[in-house]
Amino acid sequence: MQTLPDLIPFDPNALLLGYQKRWVADTSQLKIAEKSRRTGLTWAEAADDVMIASLAKSEGGSDVFYIGSNKEMAREFIDACAMWAAQFNRAAGQIQEELFNDEDKDILTYVIYFASGFKIKALSSNPKNLRGMQGVVCIDEAAFHEKLAEVLKAALALTMWGAKVRLISTHNGVDNLFNQLIQDSRAGRKSYSVHTITLDDACAEGLYQRICQVSKQLWTPEKEAAWKAGLLRETATEDDALEEYYCVPKASSGAYIPRPMIERAATEGKAKLRFECDAKFMEWTEDERTVITSEFCLTQLLPHLQALNPDRRHAFGVDFARSADLSVYAVCAVQPDTARHFDLTLEIKNCPYNQQKQIMLFMLANLPRLIGAAFDATGNGGYLAEAALIRYGSSMVEAVQLNEKWYREWMPKYKALYESGYIQIPKDEEIILDHGHIQVINGVPKIDKSRSKDKSGKRHGDSAVAYCMAVRASYMTGGEIDFIPLPDKHSDRSENDEFDDFISNWDW
C-alpha cells in the first residue's frame, strides 16, 4: 500500500485533494471514513471504483456495488463514475437504468458496464441484494442506513473470496454501529483502516480553495474563515455542528473508562514508589544531587527492578513534569496471554532535569527484555525523550507529541485492556483518580484540564498518560534489549568499590 503524507498542500492542477488521495491509495480490504459533510470523499471513491472496474481480472479488476441511503445518492454516484470514466479515458458504456427485483418490487437502479466485463452498479440497501455478488462494496452514509448491521453482514461475507468493503459516513450518534466499528478498530478489536476527515482537515488540504477554483472565485484566508464560520453558525446546536463537521458523534462526553472497570484492574502487590525533592535539593551541588539520586536508585529502585520477571518482555512509559505536576515512569510487563501488568510505577516530584534523566537511564538499563519506551515529548519532556533516543535509538524509543491524533489512536487500545480484563495496575486511590481525568472531549478521549490533589500537591492524570505511553511502547517492534545485572553484592569486592564504579562509569 502506498503511504502518502498526512498533509498534502493544495495543488490546483491535481484532480484529487490530499485526503482523497490517501483514501484511494489505501488498498485495505476493510476501510472506513468518518467525515465532515460535503468533503467530496464519495467523489474520490467513484474515481477509485472506475479504475477497479475498468481493469481486467488478471490486473485486479472486479465489479463494484454502491449502496446509498436513497435513489438520488445512487444517481449522483453513478454520474460521478461516468465523469471519471471519461476523464480517465476508460472504455465504458452509457449509464443504463435497470429494473431490480427487491422483495417483489421492481426497483429502478443504475449501472455502467466497462469493456473489461465488469460493472459499477447501484443497489438498494436490502442486504439480500448482495447475495451471489462478488466485488467491491461501498456503503455510503453508512450511519444512516436502517439495516446497516444486516447490510454489513452480507457485505463481509463477500470478503471470503477477496472482496473489499468501504464504509463512508458522517456520524449519527455515539451509539450508532458506524461509530462502534470505528471505536473497535481503534482499540484493535476490528481491522478496519480508519480515515478521519474533519472540516478543518479538508480545508487544510484545499477544500475551500477547490470550491473557489470551481466557482471561479478568488480564494483568501479571510473568505475561507468566514465560510467556515457561516457553516457552523447555521447549524441548530453546537453538538450538531461538531457531529456534522468535526466527526464528533452526539452524546460523547464524560468519563472515558468507568471507575468500576479501573477498580477491577487494581491489583495488590503492584509497586508504587516516589522520589520527591524538597527545596533544599536545589541547594546541593550537581555532584551531591547525583550521589543522592544514585543512592535512591540502588537502595529503593533496584530491588524492585530485580524482582521483575526476567522471562517477560517489558515496556516503559513516561509522562513528564518538572514542578507543577508529577513525572511518572511506568514499567509494563507483557504477559504470554497479551495482558499488560504495571508491575512498577515511580512518581517523581519537583526533580531537576538531570536527575530525572539519571533515574530514567538507570531504569531502562535494568529492565529485563526491554522492547520499547514511549515518552511524552511535549514541551520540556523532549529533554528526556532525546536522552533516551541518543542511548537506544528511534527503533526502541518514541518521542510522542501529545495531540488529538495520538489520543484518538492509542486511548481506545488502552481502554480495550480494561474492557477485556487484560490489565493490572497498582491498587492505589491516587492512580485510580488519575484515570478519571481521561474525558471524552469533542469526541476525543484525552486528559482534561482539571487537577486533583494528592498528599503533597496536585495531579493531572499523570499516571494515566504514563500507562498509555507504556502500552504504546509495548507494541514497538524495534528489537529487544536485555539488562546486564550489577555485580552480586556477595562478591569479593566491597560495596563501596561497586558504588564508585557505578558512579564513575555512568553517562550523566
Curated annotation (Swiss-Prot):
This is Mu-like prophage FluMu protein gp28. It comes from Haemophilus influenzae (strain ATCC 51907 / DSM 11121 / KW20 / Rd). To phage Mu protein gp28. The lineage of its organism: Bacteria, Pseudomonadati, Pseudomonadota, Gammaproteobacteria, Pasteurellales. Transmembrane segments: none annotated. It comes from the Bacteria.
